[in-house]
């Protein structure tokens, strides 16, 4: 059932389907409204908060007060008194706890009662952004005697740890919500952990909407400072039309929007994509001279399929669609460029249209696309052509003049250290994690590996011998790996008191029902080193930083303390442990979906909305699974999910070290960046990843398992990128965009042709160490846009794609009981380059000479 709430909660209407709710909203011309999906089951109405009701549900949510100044204990007491009277009548019990400016509330009752009450709560103007922390069935009431008794934090305890911890976790959780994929957000609103959900097959219409020639905009030095504004405009236009037509934004990928609709909204999908083009045309006509928004055009491909909606990855996660139809949609979008049309869609999409719309379309023929054996039949709407070459010429000839945009991009290196956004995770070299392929140890990554140093902009190589002694506070949460007795807690306190006093560290450790929440105060270096030791402690796992920032004066006394919540505070307010445990659990889950730069900026006590758009030079990395379509076309959805999760986790384990960051997870493709002065480290990560794939194949060599056929190629390219925060309509994206983003995908693609698993371009080769540059790379017969490319030398890094393909065919044949086809050995092309062609010095390669470029075959 779906509930539509409008007029600030005064009007509520229920519907059986989402279509009915959307149609009513459109027909009634309702602008500001909220829609909720609920499950209703027959239930006996509760009465008076008694514990005799059946089919009960418990819902916990977090919200932020719109007027925290008036929320004193007296105000909350009166609000709770009124709520108690009203909620007793409908049989709802629970509690309300307030810690400025956040409210934590639990309500218990039947499905029907909670759905009605929560709809009104969500529309209450006294608070905003109601985020569900838990929502599920319960066998009885935990708070039947409380009804809606309030508890202002000042009434519960004066202990500073509780106030600080609740505020820091709630603030970070609330701020990260807008970066969460909508599909994952919907799961959390239903009280479910997205990472724990099994893959769900869906029949959907998928689209890739391209911002035409966005790479040319990025390549034009006169337009670099407007790139963030162009992207933000594109995000807002896509969000408005996609979500306004009943669709869902899957992700944004450097000037590309991936979205999907249920199949019963196919016509709305095509109309929304056309409206995006019309909106951009209107924006172009309204721009002042010199605005790059006047160069924005869209081009899209649409396809129907049955992918699965699932969580991909664990340390770095994405809740998205996976399936062969996603790749086909991307190929159709590429065909739109050839036909000079703003919208191209497949025969499968045409079959979902009604006769009226079918009469409007025209056929565009049958075409072969990459990764698909059968050709695709495509259609388009008649109308004006969209000439991509014309758009490129306009961009190349464009001059902004004196125009000044609202979101100017600044050079990262030109900013003072204190103003630089934390785009790199600057982990101290002395504390590097051991390199282990695959999943590594049991400890999870803390926002992609030990981020506390960069969070507070701790000292780098220029630190003096005594270290940075600036007073700093750090709060983290973790889960105990085993039950902790009073003796265990006493032992922890004795050890911590002795060691921390020597380092001038004060603070508190709170233990709540298996959850550790610790705050440390002291010199920056001492706090950071202690935190890194804590992460290796086998008594706890899932260690996650909540807050780290400079401190004016110490909050805690000189004697370090440990507080057991069950002993003191919970005796006054028992629900407190539920709030802390659930909030910490939800925060840990949410943090893996949010860009690492945003998390570091947020946990340093900053507003992520204030992240400054910057441009800088980085080494870009792109990798994906070889012959992924062939491998998965005859595999089950569960196997596809398993392959992607295994590969993505291996990528994050190899990549997320030494300042490298994962940018996007796109099906089986992973993109990342590394500091421009750390090319050797990027190559080492690529070697680790390819080694993992080889070891994985060896582990399943005698088993009919798809993991026995997993291999990958890795491309590395250097170039300038723009890093900026985009979007203002409820969905926020932190993007890393540049012409290098497209080139690195081409570099990765030629690994299949040249026989090397790792290929780097000349700008990357120039940044390698002398040893690796002169003795570890080999010229390849391919080039990208005139740039010579080089493979990483060594037999262990050769890529035999034909062997991989034969293995995939043999696997599918063995599973189906068929005899695999054999190919004559003479017919097998060999793209491998002899390992003996190792480059020495600069012979055979000249960085900038025309002669050197002409000697390489250009793709």
Swiss-Prot record:
The keyword 4Fe-4S does not apply. GO terms for molecular function: blue light photoreceptor activity; FAD binding. Residues 815-831 have a biased composition (Basic and acidic residues). InterPro entries: A/G_cyclase, Acylphosphatase-like_dom_sf, Adenylyl/Guanylyl_Cyclase_3/4, BLUF_domain, Nucleotide_cyclase. It is found in: Cell projection, Cilium, Flagellum. GO terms for biological process: cyclic nucleotide biosynthetic process. PROSITE patterns: BLUF, GUANYLATE_CYCLASE_2. Keywords: Cell projection, Cilium, Flagellum, Repeat. One of its GO terms (cellular component) is motile cilium. Residues 56-149, 471-563 form the BLUF domain. Heterotetramer of two alpha and two beta subunits. This is Photoactivated adenylate cyclase subunit beta-like protein FB. The gene is pacB.
